[in-house]
Regions:
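N-acyltransferase acceptor-side catalytic subdomain
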Residues: 1-239
Length: 239
């Protein structure tokens, strides 16, 4: 069953009542309050802004996640990391990351990262509830500290859980590098889980696996109920 919700109603139906693809509700706004309520319950927005002016809310009952302790770093990625070709930072260029994520998807069928979504996640970022990871390529021919943004990812933070929203790579393996640094930083800072939302071969090869919604919510509640819950990522600066 798919429910309709209005901008004035700050609620979501029981996730177990959604359809087999996880679609739970249609409608509602992208306010900070609604987004945080959604993410705290494993619900996320996803819709084609060119095909519909109504937000679609999903909550799959099988969740694809990566636990920071289980991140798989391949031999080729270790070699790349040891070369020191790239710098990885947190929250240095949230706008650049989300802009690149949206640009890579602008021509895709069902593109979802439109102006309304960008504005909504920017508001979350300004409140410290959305963070970015940037991968910079150093310019060896330039003097000083010249570098270029070549990859990254961003997502929402709920307590010690990171919900990944999108990633991009302008050079091979840049998004993998961002994800590895995210997981390693979460492990040090007490982060519990990375919600990948959707399974891809790329994420599965890096340690992603499915867990049931019940287990997901147990982790989410433990990670968000604590008043002293550690931040899963650094708020700014280099890793």
């Amino acid at each position: 069953m798919i429910f309709g919700i209005s901008d004035d109603d700050l609620w979501f139906p029981n996730p177990y009542l959604g359809d087999e693809d996880g679609l739970l509700a249609v409608g509602g706004d992208l306010s900070v309050e609604r987004l945080l309520l959604a993410y705290s319950n494993g619900i996320f927005p996803w819709y084609s802004f060119r095909d519909s002016d109504m937000c679609h809310w999903y909550c799959p009952l099988s969740r694809f996640v990566i636990f920071p302790d289980e991140i798989h770093v391949s031999h080729s990625m270790r070699t790349l990391m040891n070369k020191g070709v790239y710098d990885v930072t947190f929250n240095e260029d949230f706008h650049g990351v989300i802009r690149n994520c949206s640009q890579l998807r602008i021509d895709e069928k069902g593109a979802w990262l439109g102006p309304d979504m960008i504005e909504a996640y920017t508001r979350l970022h300004e409140l410290g509830c959305a963070v970015s990871v940037e991968v910079w390529e150093k310019d060896s021919e330039a003097q000083g500290c010249a570098r270029h943004l070549v990859g990254g990812l961003y997502g929402v933070v709920i307590g010690a859980v990171f919900i990944g929203e999108s990633m991009f790579s302008l050079v091979p393996s840049a998004s993998k590098l961002a994800l590895i640094h995210l997981a390693q930083t979460m492990r040090v800072n007490g982060g519990r889980m990375i919600d990948c939302q959707l399974e891809t071969p790329h994420l599965k090869s890096m340690g992603g696996r499915h867990i049931p919604y019940e287990e997901y919510m147990k982790i989410m509640r433990r990670a968000s109920d604590r008043h002293d819950a550690p931040r899963p990522v650094q708020q700014e600066g280099r890793e």
